[in-house]
Amino acid sequence: KSTHGLTVVISPLQSLMKDQVDNLVEKGIEGAVTINGLMNPIERADAMERVKNGKASILYISPEQLRSKTIERLLMSRNIVRFVIDEAHCFSAWGQDFRVDYLYIGDFIRKLQKDKKTERKPIPVSCFTATAKQKVISDICDYFYKKLDLTLEIFASKATRENLHYTVLHKETD
């Protein structure tokens, strides 16, 4: 049983998870892994072993993976130091049509804290979204308050994304 902390990143897209892990590895951060349905059994077993033995400090999974008893047992074996929710707007009404299992995340965290007896010191939760209007932000905050008695602190940036640049190229077609 590893005593090192594990950050669990919940993300809706397998390709995004893979890209994020690949980018971290490229930057020299070897402790990031993903477990998803696109992996073959050998890759999945290797990733699970890395999580279990503490070689992984960041685990990327989809919200649906939280319903797996195997994943539940794996996370029970580790010291979870934070849950990071990517694309948190999926908690809001329109996102629930897209990924209903986002609504299970709070139940999973509550059960994990109860089973691990960490209810007095809740596991921190961070939520990220780039597309949330005020109503969606309120939905996210209300969800975590109702499920975990957790009050989220909001950090908002400008809608202008100066780091993004677009170029339109004309292409001749036959």
Q: How would you name each of these model-derived features?
A:
Residues 1-3, 24-27, 49-54, 73-78, ...:
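Conserved catalytic network of the ASCE P-loop NTPase/AAA+ motor domain
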Residues 1, 17-20, 101, 106:
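Motif I (Walker A/P-loop) of helicase-class P-loop NTPases
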Residues 4-28, 34-43, 62-67, 131-137:
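Conserved Walker A/P-loop ATP-binding site and its immediately adjacent core
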Residues 167-174:
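Conserved interdomain hinge at the start of the Helicase C-terminal
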